Structures are given as structure tokens and as C-alpha cells.
Amino acid sequence: MESIEKRILWVAERLFLEKGFSGTSTTEIAKAVGCNQALIHYYFRTKEKLFWDVFSPKMEQIVEYLDAPLEESRDFIDRIRHIIDFYFGMMSLDERLAPFIVAELIVHPSRWNFFRERFLQSEGSSQAFGKFEKMVQEEVEKGTIREIQAIDLLLDIMALCLSSFVVAPMGFGSSECDVTSRREYLERRKADITALVVNGLRKL
């Protein structure tokens, strides 16, 4: 990939996270990159395609990690704990990401359809989710967890993790004390969500 293309992606990600998709123009991206707008359209054709080129790798991480723990010799519940831990770690790297994802899905519901078709249903990208789906069904059949669809479990986990990072900015400022309190809050939320999901999987 040429350096100018990488720079466009980097600047676009920064502006999308700061201003949202609708609040960011390709003209603004071009100005920040130091290139003309035609060059952005040459590489990415549309702002929508640029958006997905920026954020698809992050969405892929969300789904692909479903497969990572499944190769290890852990029981299912322990793997669920590791998935939640990974999602919190991923979102902690840039806490603007979770509010951005939630806002974009609310403003542009069609993006959820794109996410589902590309990352959960397409033949190539759905392998990790397919393995996760199979494991959930096996655990249900063994009687170790209650009846639940894999997609419902994944969405429950995603919603709970995302909401923690959406709410966190509301109660804390930027001082050192607030940063520490925020970190402690997120650690508590991770523990609470893990307990909630794990307990919710148990058969009644």
C-alpha cells in the first residue's frame, strides 16, 4: 500500500472518530492529508467505502477473536471470559471507538445489515463465527448451558461491552484522579459483565 493511501486511512479514522461519519467530508480529509479530493476518490471511490476500509479491520477483530480461544484447551465458560476480556482490551486502546460504533449503528441502521452479511454470513469471514456457533450448539446439547442462539450471545456480549465505554465518559473528567476512577470503573464493569453473561448461560 502506498504511503499516501495509508495516510488517508489514518486521517480518515481520526476524523471519523472525532466528528462521526456525517460530520466528516472527503474535502476535510483531503485537506488534513495534504492532497486533493480527487486522490481520495481515486483510492476509495466513495466516503462510504473509505469508512468500511478504515473500520472493517476492527470489526473483523471482533468476530475473528471468537475463534482464537476456541483452539485452546479451555472450557466454554472460560473462553467466554477471554472473549469479554479481549473486547474490553480492544476498546480500551481507543475509547472513542465504542461510542462511535454505537452512534453509527443508530444513525445508519443499514450498517448493521452490512456487518451481519460481511462478518457473520459471508463464506470467508464467517468461519470464526461458524465455529463459535457450532460450539454454542454443542454446549446446549450437552446441557452445560441453557438454550441460546450464538448470534444472540455475541450481540449480548457486544452490547454490554460497548455500553460500558459509552457511559464511562459521562461520569469522569480528565484529571489523574478521574482517569484512575474511570479505569477502576471499567474493570468493575468487565467483572460485572462477565458474571452477568456467565450466570445468564446457566440452565435454570
Put a short name on every predicted segment.
Residues 54-83, 116, 135:
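Amphipathic alpha-helical linker/stalk segments
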Residues 86-89, 93, 126, 130-142, ...:
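C-terminal peripheral helix-coil segments that are non-catalytic and often amphipathic
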